[in-house]
Amino acid sequence: FCTVIILILCIMKSTRCILSIILGLLAGWLPLGAVTVLKNLQVEYQTNPLGIDVSQPRFNWQMESDRYGACGQAYRLWVADSPEQLAAGRYIYDSGKVLSGESVGVVYQGKALQPSTRYYWKVSVWDESGTEITSTEPAWFETGLLGSGWSGARWIGSSETQLSKYRSHYVIDYDVRVAEGNDKAAFVFGARDADNYVSAELDLNGSGDARFILRHTTDGKTTQDASESLASIIPASDKHKAHHIRLKVTTAQYALKYFVDIEIDGKTLVNSSLTPEEKERKSRGDFWGGKEGAFTVYPYPDGELVYHCRLYAIGFLQPKGQTATFSNLCISEDTWNTLLYNPAETYVEKGEGKLNVWYPGENVSAPMLRKAIKIEKPVKSARLYATARGVYEFSVNGQKVGKDYLNPGWTDYRYRIMYNTYDITDLLRPGDNGIGAMLGAGWWSEHSGFLTGWQDQYGTRQSLLGKIVIEYADGTRETIVTNDSWKCYDRGPITFNGLQNGEEYDARKEVNGWDAPGFDDSSWKPATLFAAPPVNVEIQGYVGSPIQNNVTLTAQSMVEPIPGVYVYDMGQNMVGVPRLTFKGKAGQEITIRFGEMNYPETIPTEPVAPYTIAMYKEKKGQVYTDNYRSALSTDRYILRGDAAGETYEPRFTFHGFRYVEIHGLERPLPLEAVKGIVLESIGVRTSGYETSDERVNRLFSNIIWGQRGNFLSVPTDCPQRDERMGWTGDAQVFARTATYNMNVDPFYTRWLYSVRDNQGDDGSYANYIPVVGFPPHGAEDGGGAMGWMEAGVIVPWQMYQQYGDVRILEQHYASMVAYMDYLERRAVRYVQPFGGFGDWLAIEPTNSMLTNTAYSAYDALIMEQVAKRLGKDADQRRFRTFYENVKRSFNDLFVNEEGRTFAPTVESIFGKDSQVGMWPGTAATEAKIVDTQTSYVVPLQFDLFNEKNKPLAIRHLVENIKKHNYTLTTGFIGTPYLNLVLSDNGYDDVAYKLFEQTAYPSWLYPVLQ
């Protein structure tokens, strides 16, 4: 994603100017005749939006003319509460003629808008000749609830919690009694099949001390992990009594290891083999794995890339001739204290030496909720206001409501939940109507981020909040809300769903007509009521671009690498879900896997460990998924056996992929039966780029597809693996390009709410937003990496520059000032501390004190301009002074006499006891020359070199580029500015050579792979 950031659009200054520039260039050959129109009328940067939840919305329009130099000199804006009133001149707001050429962000100044009301508007513009042009296209906006409340609506859901077999943190409790004359009782968890599982065995050991033995079996080979005496817990006289076993299981990063804490009869089992150092480490825990359990089970210690330390199947493995009784079995989680599985059975296991396992909780599916309503009068309009803790999909009379996916999207639900507004007028019918909703895990529960401990980030059980307002033709209104009069069913077809791990769907469990009128729901249970969020959580009208499908791909080719396995190439790396159409027998299971590339047809002769030639031969042509790490990214579908065929499109997940691998078919699907439903949150495309060089065109296409894939509710770093997080560094370096490519003002406005919500008390911004971490509180440290935290300053500034969005500066200003306070407090001699990510993934690492300090200067430059735009004169002077001081210190401390970049020691700036940060590289223990591309590019872009040093820095930069044969050595923060700096300083020729380079590392290198 980040390696394709280029600045080929740098000639553009602002989206407000692009249209007039183009028309000016075309004026020489356009036909004569003054034709000027007003078009693209928008409210809050959206066309005819529903559910606007702001009291003073903003209006935009574009003036289009075939005459050179046409421009607006004045405008007049009218708003009415019906088309008839607008035509008759009876307005609720008339701006009067305003002598201004502004056409972006014009603020409504009329009387208070009413909630749940549609308003119509038009605008007139007077051009430079005084001619009045009035808009003709229909334009309206509709308010949301505007704080009017939810009319008693309650959060509803299921009384049961869906238990995933892919769960990585859980607690297993059970009672066990070994029959007289017997010695052993073995419980099993983590069973993927008969050759892969973990066993926890109580061994009464005849006349000896009872023992507890932990083993794992991998590919049929059994290894003992622990054997501990129970002499202090189970005396000889109690051996054959019932004993309570508790296994608290967690996993290491990427689910590579099981960590197990064991209690027997309420007493903790101590691992006697641990060294003092291991005990200390396990008690302390760390960022990557949290607190390790006392015992470790490592199924693949040789480092094979598998991520299978999960719950999977549970059961028993009784040795031959050994009988034991298991009872009071339950599985829970101890973060939100949720009981996940609690069967009533007592299991008497008579030893046959065979594995007896099952998937716990597989009968609980995604909740389905319904309500029957009756319409007895003609309907004028009907609106649905809805949100969920989780994700949801509404339907009315069997038809899906809206075009969105995975609503309400991702915000930090600890602070903010957004609701959606839908027009359901045309879905209602006279008489009986059926209202339905399904709930999925979404970002609320299941796995988040790149650590398997980051599970159930906000809770374990999903819930729905809804309100339907029906306005009848006679002027009366009826309101229907979610409450315990709704019915719930949790034995439906979606047997599992998670954004990272995929969806599992059993079509045999479909309930025909469940969301239609006349359905008999007498066997359904009343919906369970859930507590409302804490009072600090704001429930806000939806802001931003919803996740939708605007592009659909069809498979381009298919191969069969091994019999019965079919791999389809979509022709383009994409983000979304498949839509597959197939026929088969009832109960036939189809497994769908995804990959961005396949194992090569040509077998490497010297593979890099842990890969082997045998592995490459075995997997030749199949999808490669190791780069997904612990994200299983697998869908499963069980056919219902419909002779007419069945179509499957997952509802509550998404994948990043180019290749679709399908198992379980009797014959391959035709290409037209394999579709790729591209999901994205991007706005309207506002730019294009085409050259005579197909490599460059492909690069630009990659950039657009990269934006499509990573702009999904939040700006992510990657959409395919076990991360998918709103990394702020990725967001800020791409923000300028993103604002050129698409109308992303609503998208970024939405994300900046979370940026502010997650800001630290000290003013720092988080490294990824929404903040995720070990629940219930998320990441404790939040942030601290400069170049990442700068998203809180750079993104709103780019929005203002490209869209004229003053309001985002007003909304975000206090937050930005708090960040500047933070930078000033922690600086010493105007130098920022070493640490953070620095120039992440650079070929040549750059000292992070240098880049951190440079970014603090850039923050001050931006804030000087923001303060000026908002009329805050004292702040403007403050930030200018801060910038000048940083610049002076930078030249004194980071540049030597030859104009080369230089790294002083941390101690020389911060003292002996200073705490240095993390990678890349280490803090300088002795002063040394830096002399990397980034060390010149970043301060040059931020105008930090003084008059003496600037020409020297430019020369050294060019020398470095030539030394590396016109290839990139920059990383995240150096790459975006490199060509700009070269062009701005008279080196277009070097910039072109760098840009046209195809050797590694370069912009065009990945295009040719």
Residue ranges and their predicted role:
Residues 1-11:
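Short, Lys/Arg-enriched N-terminal segments with co-localized hydrophobic residues
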Residues 30, 155, 247, 1006-1009:
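Short, intrinsically disordered, charge-balanced linker/junction segments flanking boundaries
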Residues 10-19:
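Bacterial N-terminal signal peptides that target proteins for export
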Residues 20-29:
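Bacterial N-terminal signal peptides
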Residues 36-118, 122-176, 180-246, 250, ...:
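Extracellular/oxidizing-compartment recognition motifs
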Residues 32-34:
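Boundary at the C-terminal end of the N-terminal hydrophobic targeting segment
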Residues 400-401, 424, 429, 441-443, ...:
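Active-site core of glycosidic bond-cleaving carbohydrate-active enzymes
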